[in-house]
């Protein structure tokens, strides 16, 4: 392998020098995924389309360079890690290509959550439904043959794939859905076709082999390759397509995937049962299965304790918990209410004594119950001892053997020093997960893990089970594929690999082990960095909502980078520190959206703010204090400067770009025509006499301005809902401009100043405009604080609408998501428009107050998918934060206004 050889070859094939530039940061953050392994790649690359992947594999074949494809990085068995060339196939593969009535075609980087969001309007969904929907990509789900909570083996990736565009190891491309695809396949890969037909005939002719394959795949099974395809399909093209499912990047690359769709059932009822012990719960399993529910999820007592530590257990559950209690979630779904009611009645009759929540249909409570299970892995992993790495095992046994399996697994964990394990899983399918943790700091601990694994393998196989049900073989179970399949079928697995990948360059070491001890090598050591992020298990749930994903780093990658910074030698630390200034700091919007999806409630933005504060000097902290003291004047002058710039837009744009070119990156704001320059003095806003409401206009009004605010206040006064505005607010600011930049002393002074003001208004409900200002101010006191759009939604929504809007497109804000204020924007939009659209691709715009002016590529990156989704939509576009409106206007090229302005237009 020659890393320079493959880069030189890629340059000859048309890759730019910029795209081939290597980064120490990227190598280190891509050396880890959600698994317990760590392998640093020699080379990294981002692919933008299937043609680039074709050229990458052509170059890799010519230079014998190992290639590993990395998408969501949420896999738990080490299959997205490699020593050769690691290729990101998420950032550039985000298109939902075509939605039809029975199928959807999408690129592999689209998360399952976002894909289902696009299908929601048609009441359809894809089959695989892993707990990691927000992180798991379509390519990863198919590559691992993901299943999940409800799909079982009936609707998993294998069962629902229709076709794909496949890139073979030598770079050749085959579209399996073209009319002449089989003919083309035979011409393109005659040796592969012949070998597939030979293996098919061999398995079918041998009754014992056929029976064993059937047995192995009756349960969930992600060990080895999908050998059941040789029994399920005659046509080599169909065998090819289904062998790719679960192949974990070892047979080729899926550049575009077509999946069959399932209907979303119209009504659902969720039940939560508590049994006195794990054994009693498992003994009840066959009776529960006989009721034919859509899902059965088990959580043992240790799981419940971990959930309780995060305050995620409802009081009703806590009240009935005993020492060994085990919870089971059972869900029924149907297309008709009566059908659902009948199923629920039958179930309640059998299990009335165990039901804590019965037949829950209200979405908020249903979601709360399911959040317990979906976030469980990361929450349990958070509770691990400091400095240890979490290992989530994943096995399947016949459901009737679950009781003995759980009992024996618990005994094994105790025997090998892991204590009482955490056990949970999809028990309808006999699929259980159990978590252990270890620091692997000594040879003795590694030996303990080796002995534990050997005993676990023996136990599961003795029960007729499978060693990996959902998480893929990866490196974790590759040495045990022969034990799972037997010698004869293992030889067939090796023949499949050889036929697809004769040079062995595709993800070597995955599925077919590089050594018998591969599962004991390259084990991840977790470094302690900061209390804010130390509980991170690197699951990747945070990544899909991050505005810098695909541009620089994601929240998980920022955390990993700083973990690596703490352990690397001085020479690497120097380079890493330099790269992280832009990749980790300057391109972090600190919006906190990562916390929304994080199961353990980590706000990486807070961590980055802390880093910024540490990097501030005495001089910059002092200048921050001066700015805070004179903030009213600064905001007013900034507004005037923007108005002047608006009069000479070309000069302003050119001048700011020239200045930015000669100053350090991120120091000079770049003027844009999307900037609204209507700043006004807050003292001119109309104040009413009110004992109930006090309005604190944000300083953004001085800078950018929203003239509709004055009209909102006038309408409120006229409608008998007057709003009082305190005097002397010239210097008022929530403090976000200081906290976001790490100017802690200035922020503390502003917070102290605000405290006196808020105390004087403690008898009133506080109102502030702008969702980001609302979020910050809400955290500074216990006084009820609402965003101005919430005031309108709660008090003025009955005012008659005179002009209804045809279609409104909403851009929810990250801060509005955190506080719940986005719901007010939705309510107002539904009141004034016939049609309201929330884009499936919305995420934080990355403007972050002024970050979009300082690092404009951040906003362009963050808004690109949302802009593309809406390119042909004729609508009024609104949001509820002035900086976000500027960011969205600039990023999409379409003007965004405030929801308040839209409402004022409609009622005036």
Which residues does each predicted region cover?
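N-terminal flexible segment immediately upstream of the FAD-binding catalytic core
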Residues: 1-58, 62, 72-102, 131, ...
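N-terminal glycine-rich flavin-associated loop
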Residues: 35-67, 89-130, 146-198, 263-276, ...
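Terminal amphipathic helices with adjacent charged low-complexity linkers/tails
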Residues: 293-386, 421, 425, 555-563, ...
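Iron-sulfur cluster-binding cysteine motifs and their immediate structural context
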Residues: 504-510, 541-565, 587-614, 776-778, ...
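A gly/ser-rich beta-alpha-beta helix-loop segment of oxidoreductase catalytic cores
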Residues: 36, 76, 119-163, 168, ...
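Ferredoxin-like iron-sulfur electron-transfer modules
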Residues: 518-538, 568-590
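Iron-sulfur cluster-binding electron-transfer modules in prokaryotic oxidoreductases
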Residues: 501, 604-908
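Non-heme iron-sulfur electron-transfer modules
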Residues: 512, 518, 549-583, 601-627, ...
């Amino acid at each position: 392998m020659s890393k320079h050889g493959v880069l030189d070859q890629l340059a000859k094939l048309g890759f730019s020098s910029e795209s081939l530039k290597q980064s120490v940061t990227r190598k280190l953050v891509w050396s880890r995924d959600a698994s317990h392994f760590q392998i640093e790649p020699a080379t990294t690359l981002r692919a933008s389309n299937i043609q680039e992947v074709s050229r990458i594999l052509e170059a890799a074949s010519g230079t014998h360079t190992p290639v590993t494809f990395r998408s969501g990085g949420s896999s738990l068995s080490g299959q997205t890690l490699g020593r050769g060339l690691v290729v990101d196939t998420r950032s550039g593969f985000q298109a939902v290509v075509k939605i039809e009535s029975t199928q959807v075609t999408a690129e592999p980087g689209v998360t399952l959550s976002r894909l289902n969001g696009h299908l929601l309007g048609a009441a359809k969904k894809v089959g695989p439904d892993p707990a990691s929907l927000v992180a798991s990509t379509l390519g990863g789900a198919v590559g691992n043959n993901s299943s999940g909570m409800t799909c079982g083996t009936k609707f998993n990736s294998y069962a629902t794939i229709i076709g794909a565009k496949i890139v073979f190891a030598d770079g050749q491309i085959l579209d399996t859905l073209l009319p002449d695809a089989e003919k083309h396949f035979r011409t393109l890969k005659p040796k592969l076709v012949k070998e597939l037909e030979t293996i098919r005939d061999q398995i079918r002719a041998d009754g014992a082999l056929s029976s064993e394959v059937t047995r192995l795949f009756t349960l969930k099974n992600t060990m080895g390759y999908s050998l059941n395809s040789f029994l399920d399909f005659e046509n080599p093209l169909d065998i090819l397509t289904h062998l790719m499912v679960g192949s974990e990047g070892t047979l080729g690359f899926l550049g575009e995937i077509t999946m069959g769709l399932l209907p979303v059932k119209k009504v659902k009822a969720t039940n939560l049962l508590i049994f006195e012990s794990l054994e009693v719960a498992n003994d009840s399993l066959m009776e529960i299965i006989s009721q034919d529910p859509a899902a059965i999820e088990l959580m043992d007592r240790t799981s419940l304790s971990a959930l309780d530590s995060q305050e995620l257990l409802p009081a009703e559950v806590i009240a009935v918990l005993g020492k060994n209690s085990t919870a089971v979630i059972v869900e029924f779904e149907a297309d008709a209410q009566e059908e659902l009611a009948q199923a629920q009645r039958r179930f309640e009759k059998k299990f009335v004594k165990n039901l804590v929540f019965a037949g829950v249909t209200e979405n908020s409570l249903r979601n709360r119950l399911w959040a317990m299970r979906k976030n469980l892995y990361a929450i349990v992993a958070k509770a691990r001892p400091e400095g240890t790495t979490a290992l989530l095992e994943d096995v399947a046994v016949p459901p009737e053997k679950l009781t003995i399996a759980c009992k024996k697994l618990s005994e094994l964990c105790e025997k090998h020093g892991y204590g009482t394990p955490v056990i949970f899983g999809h028990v309808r399918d006999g699929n259980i997960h159990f978590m252990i943790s270890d620091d692997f700091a000594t040879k003795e601990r590694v030996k303990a893990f080796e002995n534990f694994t050997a005993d676990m393998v023996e136990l599961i196989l003795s029960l007729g089970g499978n060693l990996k049900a959902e998480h893929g073989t990866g490196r974790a179970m590759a040495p045990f594929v022969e034990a799972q399949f037997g010698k004869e079928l293992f030889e067939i697995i090796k023949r499949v690999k050889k036929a697809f990948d004769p040079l062995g360059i595709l993800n070597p070491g995955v599925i077919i082990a590089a050594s018998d001890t591969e599962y004991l090598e390259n084990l991840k050591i977790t470094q302690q960095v900061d209390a804010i992020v130390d509980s991170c298990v690197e699951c990747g749930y945070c990544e899909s909502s991050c505005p810098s994903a695909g541009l620089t780093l994601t929240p998980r990658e920022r955390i990993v980078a700083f973990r690596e910074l703490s352990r690397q030698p001085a020479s690497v630390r120097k380079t890493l520190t330099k790269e992280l200034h832009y990749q980790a700091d300057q391109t972090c919007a600190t919006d906190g959206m990562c916390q929304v999806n994080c199961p353990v409630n980590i706000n990486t933005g807070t961590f980055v703010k802390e880093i910024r504060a540490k990097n501030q000097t005495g001089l910059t902290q002092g200048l921050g204090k001066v700015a805070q003291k004179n903030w009213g004047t600064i905001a007013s002058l900034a507004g005037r400067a923007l108005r002047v710039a608006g009069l000479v837009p070309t000069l302003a744009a050119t001048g700011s770009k020239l200045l930015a070119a000669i100053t350090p990156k991120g120091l000079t704001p770049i003027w844009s025509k999307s900037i609204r320059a209507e700043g006004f003095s807050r003292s001119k806003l109309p104040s009413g006499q009110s004992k109930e409401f006090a309005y604190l206009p944000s300083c953004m009004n001085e800078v950018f301005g929203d003239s509709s605010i004055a009209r909102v206040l006038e309408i409120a006064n006229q409608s008998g809902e007057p709003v009082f505005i305190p005097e002397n607010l010239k210097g008022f600011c929530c403090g976000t401009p200081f906290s976001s930049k790490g100017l802690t002393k200035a922020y503390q002074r502003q917070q102290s100043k605000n405290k006196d003001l808020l105390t004087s208004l403690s008898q009133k409900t506080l109102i502030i405009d702008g969702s980001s200002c609302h979020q910050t101010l809400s955290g500074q006191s216990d006084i009820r604080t609402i965003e101005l759009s919430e005031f309108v939604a709660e008090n003025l929504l009955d005012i008659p609408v005179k002009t209804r809007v045809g279609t409104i497109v909403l851009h929810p804000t990250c801060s509005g998501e955190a506080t719940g204020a986005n719901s007010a924007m939705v309510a107002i939009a539904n009141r004034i428009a016939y049609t309201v659209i929330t884009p499936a691709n919305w995420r934080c715009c990355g403007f972050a107050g002024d970050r979009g002016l300082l690092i404009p590529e951040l906003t362009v990156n963050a808004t690109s998918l949302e802009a593309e989704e809406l390119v042909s939509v004729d609508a009024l576009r609104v949001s509820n934060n002035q900086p976000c409106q500027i960011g969205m206007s600039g990023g999409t090229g379409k003007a965004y206004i405030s929801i308040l302005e839209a409402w004022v237009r409609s009622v005036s």
